[in-house]
Amino acid sequence: MSEAENKLPFIPEEWSNAASSVSCSSLQPVIALVCGPKNSGKSTFSRNLVEVLLQRYKRVAYLDTDVGQPEFTAPGFLSLTIVDKSILESDWTVPCVKTPERCFFYGDVSSKRDPKAYLRYVYTLFDYYQLHFCKSSENKTELPLVINTPGWVKGIGYELLVDVLRYVSPSHVVKINISAYNKNLPAGLFWLDGNDDETAHLIEIQSAYQDRYNQSILIHKDARLMRDMRIIAYFRQCFKGKEVNTIKELTHELASHIPYEVPISSLTINHLHCQIPSSEVYYSLNASIVGLGISTEVFEDLPSCVGLGIVRGIDTERGILYVITPVPENLVEKVDLLLQGYIQLPTCLLEVKDYRSPYLSANVLAST
């Protein structure tokens, strides 16, 4: 087996049949929501489903509602991405970063902190999909939609999933079950009550336990590590064309990279989920990850977010923020909102030895 094949996931026959059932459906548009407990394989199945749909459609819409481990963006985002080429051909050991069609910066890795804001973002992204890619007209072609969901399926997480299911009314729901029965979602069309006239094609499959060699493939992901990898993959885009293969190389490049100078007077700073005293605003921004928003580009009164930036330094005398971001200059010039949440720089970028990088290294003077 080739090295490339080794990097592809094993797709069980049951999963292949489920994906084919969705793809071959006569229902239009195809709106497939994938749900199940954490570590059940939702992301893997969703990516495979996109691949199967691309065999029939030129493009597939992907609505990612998992703010902790999103598929195509850095953590903290809710996004709608249009996929027009194979994603299974990419190396599955490396996070796949794509530019979304529309995204919002929620600013945390769990919907627990602000469920109402979370639902509003999800609903707005779905409305955007319906308006631009679903409703039939002479100039529009309906795109199938795959919705990936978080693995938090108990308590508030369960209630949020039910709310999303009722709002989007999917044509297909793929429910992945694991061996720990008490961690699974309820049986049947659990999100519908007796008064609902709507229905959906429910497909229940088992989590993939073994590969083609009958070896266990259950991987308990380190959530923090996965988030750090996605943040690293995102900011590596600042250095396209350069060989940046190690954490040390990335830290060096980030520290030496020429940042954008952004006048503080041109910005509105929005602290998500918390209140920051005015005397500590600059201190809180320094060496932080922020969402870059454009207030003039709104949909349903929500400003768009064009990406993330690292505030590498602040010149309070000149009133300048120094920001590193892979966002193109023509978009950075439009940014007038800084959205600060709880997405943090990976500690590995702060602890690289043998290199002193201002704001990106822990340089502590020894006590005397």
UniProtKB/Swiss-Prot annotation:
The answer to whether the entry has keyword Ribosomal protein is no
User: Where is it localised?
Assistant: Nucleus, Nucleolus
| UniProt keywords, alphabetically | ATP-binding, Kinase, Nucleotide-binding, Nucleus, rRNA processing, Transferase
Organism name:
Arabidopsis thaliana
Q: Which GO terms describe its biological process?
A: rRNA processing
The UniProt similarity line reads: Belongs to the Clp1 family. NOL9/GRC3 subfamily.
Main localization category: nucleus
Report the function annotation for this chain.
Polynucleotide 5'-kinase involved in rRNA processing.
In the UniProt record, which is one GO cellular component term? nucleolus
What Gene3D superfamilies does this protein's entry cite?
P-loop containing nucleotide triphosphate hydrolases (3.40.50.300)
Q: What is this protein called?
A: Polynucleotide 5'-hydroxyl-kinase NOL9
Q: CDD domains from the entry? A: SIMIBI
Chain residues that bind ATP: 36-43
Give the GO molecular function terms: ATP binding; polynucleotide 5'-hydroxyl-kinase activity
Does this UniProt record's set of keywords contain Lipid biosynthesis?
A: no
**So what EC number does this one have?**
2.7.1.-
Q: What is the lineage of its organism?
A: Eukaryota, Viridiplantae, Streptophyta, Embryophyta, Tracheophyta
Q: Which cysteines are joined by disulfide bonds?
A: none
Q: Which SUPFAM superfamilies match?
A: P-loop containing nucleoside triphosphate hydrolases
